[in-house]
Amino acid sequence: LIISAAAIADNIRFKVSGHVLDNRTMQPIQYAIVKVSNLELWAATDANGMFIIENVPQGAVSIEVSTLGYVTRTVQFNIRHNTDLKNIRLKEANLSIPGVEVTARKRSTMGTTTYSIDRTTLDHSQVLSLNDIMALLPGGQTVNSTLTDDSRLALRSTTGEKGNASFGTAIEIDGMRLNNNASMSETQSASTRNISTSNIESIEVIAGIPGVEYGDISNGMVKVNTRRGHTPWIVEASMNPYTRQVALTKGLALAHNAGTLNFSIEHAQSFTDITSPHTAYSRNILSTTYNKVFRMKGSSLNLTAGLTGNIGGYNSEADPDAFRDTYQRQRDNQLRANMMLDWLYNSRSSGVFNITLQAAFSTADRRSDNNTNTSSSSTQASLHTTTNGYAIAQDYADGMGTGSIILSPTGYWYVRSFNDQKLQSLQLKLKGEWTRRILSAVNKLTVGTELNSTRNNGHGTYYDDMRLAPTWRPYDYSLLPTMHSLAMFIEERLTMGRLMLVGGLRNDITIISGSEYGTAASLSPRFNARYNIIKGKNVSLTLHAGYGKSVKLPSFQVLYPADTYTDRLVFTPGSTADGKAYYAYYTNVQRAIYNSNLKWQHSNQMEAGLEAMVGKARLSLSAYWNRTYNPYQTLNVYSPFAYNQTSQSALEGCSIAAADRIYSVDPSTGVISVTSATNGNTVNLPYSIRRTYTANRQYVNGSPVTRYGLEWVAEMPIINNHHTLGLSLRIDGKYYHYRGTDNTLIAGCPNGIGDQAEGSGTQPLIGYYVGSNVASASTTSTPTVSNGMMNKGCSLNTTLTARIPQLRLIMTMRLEATMLNYRRNLSSNRTTIALNEAGDVTGTKYVGQTDHYVAVYPKYYSTWDNPSERIPYAEALLAAKDNNPTLYRQLCDLIVRSNTAYYFNPQNISAYYSANFSVTKEIGRWVSLSFYANNFFNNLASVRNKQTGLKTSLFDSGYIPKFYYGASVRVKL
């Protein structure tokens, strides 16, 4: 910490007052927020628009006045005595204001890369889902938005990459974190399609290194601020070919200075097929926010409380094209409540103290309901056994549930299944800030603590009729413990003239009750710096740089994995006269293996950038490097296993007539007994021993993943007439590079484990391979031809914006060009062979050759009777070729081969582009119309993929959006 006890504080303080008015009507504006920049001093205007800020230090002061629906105004002056700023006039935020922006703006006051997106930009872009903001960031590419697409936010990354980038991207709404850690079905960030976009006032995207206040994060953060303050009634409707959206919002100024109450109602629905608009996703959101500032002598207390609920989800029940009475329904119900108390104490001698208490609770209901039709001409075994051992199928009887094998009916029937997930989270945060000016420097100390609790109260998968339930085992999520995390953080920010330094440390303590992982702690240091080299009216240059570590806590999928089951058919009798066959199975329960060496995933980030202004032209650059360590990964651990199998030929010597037989199985030995229904005589059938492996999952840490890139924005006016026409040019883009290779030792067999009869002279083998190309922790890593990928991309957007303030009109023409789209599968740190022919076993060492079939050898292999010994594979293969043909064939089966000769060829797509057009027109002060057309030239050109040498049409290729359009109208009442 910065020790300043020896410094001589400047105790000269003054009072600043003023009167905030509407520029058009000259009426006072109530509840406007007046802030003194850098000093954390603030006040809210009263019913007469008046404000008073006490104890403002002498010297240069910058005051920022803002309120909902108005353009923020900054007033700069030198204070040397009590100052009355008289009337501060705020202009309504509309298109009659010259210089209105409809793009993401980089915040120049931050020490890291942060972009802000305001309401005007959201309206002009007709944002339907929070994911749509990705197109507004430098180099972002437009997608045709629909709520049926549940894509997740992932900053500075692309799809198909290792490192769980989406899982590490955090989302906050009014300070409340959207938590998806308790999900049992995915390792991703929270879904955003249940968030109302009509009630958003602004969005802040922290793409760089966030402050230590923010934890459980590894790939940036998106902060959403909803509307708060007095507004007229706003009715909004928008539509595109697949989506309809209507919304009503209002901000009430309560009588007797009782605060403000904002509420919003929104309905949105998206269809999967425009020709059959029955299968759809819908959201129905009601939200309300109350805000009140209590004024006390020398202090203020700001109370904010909010409640948001959504009832919606996916539903295909009404689709007439589906099989009769079949449907799929997925709830996406959400309830979020949050409260914040912000107490400001302004001390004349000690500085400014802010104490903030935040509390939030959220619960989500994601139950799915599926009704499917099925049929069978003969009985089938439905396995519900939950313990290791042998069991034989039985006819269903009332009360039978889990723990048995039942015979399904014959004919036609429906199966109704449910998957129930109910995610709950509780958040408490207490933060204290001490800000003081010492001579020309401003020092801000932040200390805080945070408690988060997450759990899943769902019941997992279950069926409404056990008689019809297929093979399935229960896993009740509500029995899982709650995961708690406690964090403590401290940060200091020092501003000295043109230099700003920020440094902090965060400690996350994870308390995992009911899990072998117990309690774990992790430290996250973070530093940022900003220096203004040149600060002039027409020329400026600012540099910023930072370093930070951030830790991502594991999901319930990692901490409490469900058991998996392997069922092996051990006896197949002939069918009875009524078509029944009483199969016997051996069930092996596979529980995830605890990994005492598992570490929490974290990222180390470095960033540097600059912001420059020359006249009216602006330039910003951000270069970043991000390495993700210990990404969560799933693999299988194999153990030798033997079981007894009885073939149907064993019945040939059975003296009991087929119609008189009753079958049973010993649950421990697997011996099949045939009993006469007439006289009770029993015959034990002979069996053979089969040798195989059982697989248990284990969560481990994968190899590091590296990402780096460059983002840039250049803006310049072409015509700058504030009254008639404004024409500006913006060129933004990004270069991105990703490389991820997995060096984890992966056990498996590419052609399946299989089994062998005892005494056959052979035994099952397991190969151990270096790495896998599986990218998600939700999927078990298996042997693959590649163990990594390199991804490079460069996109360039050129936006021409025309503004006609007198007509209240703004138009944007945007050309999105992809200059580089390069991917290549990698195989490193392993024995990789370039083959002359697809079926070859040997060849030349692979060093990046193209147009070759490729084979990958395991590094080791092990045998069934000695699994702990890992035998070097390459040497054994050469030795067995001439000396042991049987072993040689088995070893050849462990080779992983590419299916094509171009698998390792670079996938380099030739350049392509898409042109988008947007226009917004205000009719007076009360009506606003917007229209957009994506890919309005309907580009049907072809691109060449160098991996195969083939050309592909851009139409429906996924490289650019299809021709798409939408319109919206907003009416203020």
Question: Across the structure, where does each feature detected by a protein language model lie?
Answer:
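Short, acidic, small-residue-rich periplasmic hinge/interaction motif at the N-terminus
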Residues: R13, H19-T25, A32-K35, S66-Y70, ...
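N-terminal periplasmic accessory domains that precede
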Residues: D84-R89, L130-I133, R152-A154, E172, ...
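Extracytoplasmic beta-strand/coil segments of soluble accessory domains associated
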Residues: N131, A135-R177
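Short acidic/polar hinge/loop motifs at secondary-structure boundaries
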Residues: M176-I206
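Short strand-turn segments of transmembrane beta-barrel domains in outer membranes
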Residues: R193, S202-I209, M221-G251, I265-H267, ...
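Face-selective signature of the C-terminal outer-membrane beta-barrel domain
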Residues: F294-I311, Q330-E516
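Gram-negative outer-membrane beta-barrel transporters
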Residues: T495-R498, W625, N644-A834
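C-terminal beta-signal and adjacent terminal beta-strands/loops
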Residues: T628-N630, T634, S639, A817-S898, ...
